[in-house]
């Protein structure tokens, strides 16, 4: 039975470690524009990072506060919102991240 089961990947750790790992991977992704990680972590990160980009495209104050709450870094959020204001993701309605297999 499916009582009290949360959706999403566990990634072999407890919930707090998974949350911290997604947060640090998202920060690294937005700082460096690309990261190298496992495929499973990349798939989990995609669902964490793409709403932040959608909020940045909206550009209003509520979206900015949501992004700060999710990432915890005001300067990084300001950079993301500046990129979105310059039209970095203007031509896409979703699917901002791409997972490429190496090796």
Predicted regions and their residues:
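Structured, basic alpha/beta domains of bacterial-type, RNA-associated proteins
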Residues: 1-13, 24-103
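Basic, ligand-binding patches in group-transfer machinery
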Residues: 21
